[in-house]
Amino acid sequence: PSYTFVSTADAFVLRGATCVFVDIRPDTMNIDETKIEEAITEKTKAIVPVHYAGVSCAMDEIMAIAKKYNLKVVEDAAQGVNAFYKGKALGTIGDFGCYSFHETKNYSMGEGGAILFQDDRYLEPAEILREKGTNRSQYFRGQIDKYTWVGYGSSYLPSDMNAAYLWAQLEEADKINDKRLSIWNFYHEELKELEDKGVLERPYIPEYATHNAHMYYIKVKDLRVRTKLLAYLKERGILSVFHYVPLHSATAGKKFGRFHGEDVYTTKESERLCRLPMYYSLSLEEAAEVVKALKEFPEYETIEDR
């Protein structure tokens, strides 16, 4: 999808690949699985589903397409730690899965992430890539008597302090998840009234998805209304922000990628979306202030094509 963070594309562009973007689903903001097959050519190597807001893409359909065309599936599960598709952890369904532990994520070490893969053959090259192109990991395990430069790589190692900070959160993962879900559910229940009035839309969670309350967003009629709403919330001391600018509209996106088919929803939906405050230390009282402000916003317009 074009509606994602630039890192999704960078990983491929840095290796000389061309990114082919397809449209998203307006309900989940995830890649539209029905648009994938028509974008595949003899040059296609992989399908990259992005689990937006920790809500799973339709992975059965995506995996079936990948199998049909002998393609790899690389899950961008940056926002998907402790979220699931039909009971299976996001990032563990495709050939590869990528997690992020950036400061904005549910479990954070400031920067950094993790890669998961199904095939053990990728373990050694992944370690070499992480260890500056050396076989240092094997040396530390006592498998070799000295380490040396064996391939290309860079320095992707977190410090012990970063790792310890993350580990402590992972030990409390259920507690963190429960707290975030309580905030998410509070927003969802309290904002139903405005959705029923037709002035905003709440997130949609498919039956197959178990989300992790990574974010709570609303969608208003259009960019004009959103701009007014964000300014209004800022005046009330509430930080609400939009999210991605679609990659295919960016200078580099036009240079290194292309959009296949018609952009029916990607740009339109991205211009409607506002993210509400969502973090572990947010109290329900503070969330109630956000809801109160949203209910008092005077310039909503009816969403006519809901």
Regions of interest found by a model, annotated:
Residues 3-4, 17, 24, 78-79, ...:
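Histidine-centered beta-alpha loop that forms part of the nucleotide-sugar donor binding/catalytic region
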Residues 75-109, 138-139, 145-150:
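Conserved active-site segment immediately N-terminal to the catalytic lysine
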Residues 34, 38, 46-50, 55, ...:
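PLP-dependent aminotransferase class I/II
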Residues 27-28, 81, 106, 248-249:
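Positions that flank functional sites
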Residues 5, 29, 54-55, 103-109, ...:
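Nucleotide-sugar-dependent glycosyltransferase donor-binding/catalytic pocket residues
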Residues 21, 73-75, 99, 117, ...:
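Hydrophobic residues in well-ordered beta-strands that form the structural core
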Residues 1-77, 84:
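PLP-dependent aminotransferase-like
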Residues 92-136, 160:
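Active-site PLP attachment segment
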